[in-house]
Amino acid sequence: MFPGARILATLTLALHLLHGTHAAIGPTGDMYIVNEDVSPDGFTRSAVVARSDPTTNGTSETLTGVLVQGNKGDNFQLNVLNQLSDTTMLKTTSIHWHGFFQSGSTWADGPAFVNQCPIASGNSFLYDFNVPDQAGTFWYHSHLSTQYCDGLRGPFIVYDPSDPHLSLYDVDNADTIITLEDWYHVVAPQNAVLPTADSTLINGKGRFAGGPTSALAVINVESNKRYRFRLISMSCDPNFTFSIDGHSLQVIEADAVNIVPIVVDSIQIFAGQRYSFVLNANQTVDNYWIRADPNLGSTGFDGGINSAILRYAGATEDDPTTTSSTSTPLEETNLVPLENPGAPGPAVPGGADININLAMAFDVTNFELTINGSPFKAPTAPVLLQILSGATTAASLLPSGSIYSLEANKVVEISIPALAVGGPHPFHLHGHTFDVIRSAGSTTYNFDTPARRDVVNTGTDANDNVTIRFVTDNPGPWFLHCHIDWHLEIGLAVVFAEDVTSITAPPAAWDDLCPIYDALSDSDKGGIA
């Protein structure tokens, strides 16, 4: 980046920090992983949270982790310090920076037992990676078992001073981030195998059915300003139907990919997905309900559940009395990439260099979810360590049946027929975005202007056969998994071992993670009832 552009980028980030009210770190900084008593919905419990400060003062009324932010072109150096002590939850950890390609830094991607061993309590690990050509809305979360369901998740924004949509909005800062989370009153290691959330949190706050009238998140706007809201589903399970009473949403980004603007009034968002939309605050000064209705658990909005408040400057500090009326939902097939649209390879189904069908199934006997007959079971040695130790083929890599070798510079087509059990399943591919040449609910293949993203809903209908394409231009072991964390825990994942002979060596500190972790006792690892 030339000096003038670097100065502009620094000023841009400074303005975002100045106008935002939330604590933030980035592109360098310390992230403390701590246990903290939280009461985001009026129920108090211990949680695993990410903070910019290791000290805790009483019970926190919000859950969402520290915001990480920077600019396109930045080098991120995020030092994760594990200070976990509560043995009822996992005490080790690893962090995945969701949506980043990690080109040349697959060791920093974060999934435990795929790209690294977990970080032991009392230890730290520096995630050092470059973001040369990505900008948009990302997030981070634990990628160890179901730990992020206990709270370890937060937003990650990369701003682009040359954003092609810059003329469409006036405000884009920390206060225009909207996070959606499902929250559980029982810690994950002691919860049911497939639990139902107790509440929905919007920006870390919410209410549960039958619970107290706890404070809801309030998002403040001024009349006649245009706001870029960044909507992030940090869900462990449910998808949400999101809307804001009385307002249309001009969608301009999906999963950190700029799109041709499209106006809707509701968005169905699945675990791991992100959207940016522009809201024009051109309605009567008042309070308006923000709604995020989950597909599971306590649905609806009685008593303010699944809700937050959009408040115009000058409005009273009361709950809204508005009603919902939506008729134009977002359709994935209408998401057209702004830059370089079009899927790689011949415009015919099955015409890629490598074509793989991934058939999901539910093994009732073993209570496992499988892909092509195999449940993913975390190996004792991370897949990356196995590769660096000389294992380079699917046959020699563990877990057996869950590794797929991919040659360099090939067009890959993945088809994922729907599984109704536990569906719809949102699948996330690490290390890449992909083109969705066939979406859920559609029988049409679109090679010219397919949606481009990194999490795709695979549908529930027997006729659904979601199909994606990408190019193997990024060496590494890359996870492909259901982003319903409870489903990943019982096997719904595979690993693509991509161009393994070109993988670069990790730093020395990475080499120390496994010996330290392997020496831990069960008590040191946590998750004990």
UniProtKB/Swiss-Prot annotation:
Which of this chain's residues are annotated to bind Cu cation 4?
H425, C482, H487
Q: Which residues form the Plastocyanin-like domain?
A: 25-159, 170-312, 380-499
Q: Which GO terms describe its molecular function?
A: copper ion binding; hydroquinone:oxygen oxidoreductase activity
GO cellular component entries? extracellular region
Residues bound to Cu cation 3 are: H143, H430, H481
Kindly give the InterPro entries that the UniProt entry links to this protein. Answer: Cu-oxidase-like_N, Cu-oxidase_2nd, Cu-oxidase_C, Cu-oxidase_fam, Cu_oxidase_CS, Cu_oxidase_Cu_BS, Cupredoxin
User: What's one Pfam family here?
Assistant: Cu-oxidase_2
Positions of Cu cation 2 binding: H98, H141, H483
Q: Where does Cu cation 1 bind?
A: H96, H428
Q: Which reactions appear under catalytic activity for this entry?
A: 4 hydroquinone + O2 = 4 benzosemiquinone + 2 H2O
Identify the stretch annotated as signal peptide in this record.
Answer: 1-23
Q: Which GO terms describe its biological process?
A: lignin catabolic process
Q: Which SUPFAM superfamilies match?
A: Cupredoxins
Q: Which domain of life is it from?
A: Eukaryota
- Asked if the record carries the keyword Ribosomal protein, the reply is no
* Cystine residue pairs: C117-C514, C149-C236
Q: Which PROSITE patterns match?
A: MULTICOPPER_OXIDASE1, MULTICOPPER_OXIDASE2
Query: Where is it localised?
Result: Secreted
So which cofactors does this thing need?
Cu cation
The Swiss-Prot or TrEMBL record describes its family as follows: Belongs to the multicopper oxidase family.
Job description of the protein: Lignin degradation and detoxification of lignin-derived products.
Q: Name it.
A: Laccase-1
Task: Write down the species.
Answer: Pleurotus ostreatus (Oyster mushroom)
